[in-house]
């Protein structure tokens, strides 16, 4: 645990291990009696998983960072595991979650009005009756917006719907973000995915943007 008078931080590093079937190393053989034997190869894999809870006492905001996990390990399980670990002295359930659903819609709308800080590569919106629509541009360098058919569907659905997913490229800005960075907002899981290694300054800038537009 690290802390200053304005910002405590709780970090954890955990070794995670699992076995994964690798077909390329499977073999076949026979018993002395001629019976077939199938040898299945399992590779012992390990990662060191970093988790950090950061609480800014000045703004009374916090964020939980989890390093990238392999597909078989669920982020929600790691989050619960960490919460249980610190629960005797830090009740994380007391913190309210940022509404990523609304942030997705607001960032898209900001772009559509010509004031965007992001470029949307794709989005998914769910209606009040649990029906969803999604759209995606043909390349990350092209906005999903710009055609009447897509724009009108977004406008209609966003009026009463919620943003389930936003696939954004954060645009370069003076003093913080030097080049485009793809960040995916998963509203249905309250999760922000950084798709490339990013330093703390960039992470904080993007999280602040999301807070400001939720």
Features from the language model and the residues they span:
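Intrinsically disordered, low-complexity, charge-rich terminal extensions
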Residues: 1-214
């Amino acid at each position: 645990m690290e802390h200053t008078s304005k910002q405590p931080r709780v970090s954890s590093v955990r070794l995670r291990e699992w076995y994964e079937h690798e077909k390329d190393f499977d073999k076949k053989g026979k018993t002395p009696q001629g019976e077939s034997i199938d040898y299945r190869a399992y590779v012992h894999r390990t990662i060191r998983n970093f988790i950090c809870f950061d609480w800014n006492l000045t703004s009374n905001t916090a964020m939980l960072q989890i390093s990238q996990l392999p597909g078989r390990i669920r982020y929600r399980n790691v989050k619960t595991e960490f919460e249980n670990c610190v629960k005797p002295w830090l009740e994380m359930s007391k913190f309210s979650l940022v509404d990523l659903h609304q942030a997705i819609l607001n960032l898209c709308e900001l772009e559509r009005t010509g004031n965007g800080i992001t470029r949307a590569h794709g989005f998914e919106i769910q209606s009040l009756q649990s029906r969803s629509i999604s759209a995606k541009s043909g390349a990350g360098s092209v906005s999903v917006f710009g055609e009447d058919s897509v724009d009108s569907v977004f406008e209609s659905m966003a009026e009463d719907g919620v943003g389930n997913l936003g696939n954004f490229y954060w645009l370069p800005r003076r003093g913080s973000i030097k080049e485009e960075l793809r960040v995916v907002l998963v509203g249905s899981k309250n999760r922000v995915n950084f798709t490339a290694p990013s330093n703390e300054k960039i992470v904080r800038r993007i999280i602040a943007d999301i807070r400001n537009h939720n």
